């Protein structure tokens, strides 16, 4: 965030030559940061290489009044190191065998904790809940760190916990929606609000069960710490949200397929041992997304297949959703031969 805010302040306040090659390179770098939500590529996870020098950035900053940067001023050295030091934060997500995946990755999900310590911490947590047919997704909504005594602990993302100011705004708008929602969404939103207030993952499961069972609401949404792609251990999730409405005509076509899900399962080209004898709760629809936020923006998925908890999928099914307007936009963007019009 310090990198982004510093570059945004420069972008908004620089009054020098904006036609210079280094300025164009700085502008391009900032756009990459915007698109990837950070200094690493959103797919390859490699760190961006700036096409401008540290000296140029500092010279540009010197032309802008200090008060424009506010609390960013003391962080200038750290910002420059983050951008220009290739050995610092070289990759967002390292999955190389033999490396400590946490100490060599650049996410904020773990702080001062090794891979072995994290794996042992969650193994103990799972062992204490062994035999539970409905286990929560341990660690999904927290940062793993150490307290002042050196003991490993979780900083839970909830009201009054880590990221509380942002979560307060999420809760505020969810409660606004709850006040005008109809059932079953009113009850589902209440469970989600309870989850954000308490950090209790059982409440998140309750919300997910209600959400996947709701196949009648024309307007639907996804909201929460959902996907764990950014965690090298595949445990902690990034926040995302969208609001969408059904494409009725396209939904009819997908319903024909989902209504015959058992036939497709019975005739799938896999060994019989891997086929489900009874397919449960397959809900497929086509939606138009009206709002995107968090980790699903601006690099947007073309579909949704949730929830992720295996036991919920087994007992209650899942929602498989195609996002029609995003699919269309990607298709239109792919047209052409790759050359500029000129």
Indicate residue ranges for each PLM-predicted region.
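Contiguous, non-catalytic segments that form substrate-binding/exosite surfaces or channel walls
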Residues: 11, 15-341
């Amino acid at each position: 965030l310090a990198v982004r805010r510093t570059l945004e302040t420069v972008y908004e306040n620089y009054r020098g030559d904006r036609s210079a090659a280094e300025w164009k390179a700085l502008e391009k770098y900032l756009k990459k940061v915007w698109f990837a939500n950070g200094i690493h590529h959103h797919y390859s996870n490699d760190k961006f290489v700036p096409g401008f020098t540290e000296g140029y950035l500092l010279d540009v900053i010197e032309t802008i009044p200090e008060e424009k940067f506010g609390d960013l001023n003391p962080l200038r050295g750290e910002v420059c190191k983050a951008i220009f030091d290739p050995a610092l934060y070289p990759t967002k997500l390292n999955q190389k065998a033999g490396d400590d995946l946490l100490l060599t990755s650049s996410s904020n999900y773990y702080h001062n904790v090794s891979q072995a310590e994290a794996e042992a911490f969650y193994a103990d947590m799972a062992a204490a809940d062994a035999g539970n047919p409905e286990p929560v997704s341990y660690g999904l909504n927290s940062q793993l760190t150490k307290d002042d005594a050196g003991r490993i602990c979780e900083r839970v993302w909830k009201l009054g916990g880590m990221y509380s100011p942002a979560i307060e705004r999420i809760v505020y708008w969810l409660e606004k929606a709850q006040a005008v929602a109809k059932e079953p969404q009113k009850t589902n939103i209440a469970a989600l609000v309870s989850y954000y207030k308490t950090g209790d993952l059982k409440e998140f499961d309750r919300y997910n069960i209600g959400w996947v069972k709701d196949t009648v609401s024309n307007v639907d949404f996804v909201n929460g710490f959902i996907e764990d792609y950014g965690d090298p251990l595949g445990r902690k999730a990034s926040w995302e949200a969208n609001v969408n409405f059904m494409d009725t005509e396209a939904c009819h076509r997908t319903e024909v397929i989902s209504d015959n899900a058992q036939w497709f399962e019975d005739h799938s080209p896999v060994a019989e041992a891997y086929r489900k004898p009874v397919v449960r709760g397959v809900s497929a629809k086509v939606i138009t997304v009206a709002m995107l936020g968090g980790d699903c923006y601006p690099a947007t998925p073309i579909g949704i297949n949730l929830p992720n908890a295996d036991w919920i999928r087994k007992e209650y099914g899942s929602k498989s959703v195609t996002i029609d307007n995003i699919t269309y936009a990607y298709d239109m963007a792919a047209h052409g031969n790759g050359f500029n019009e000129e």
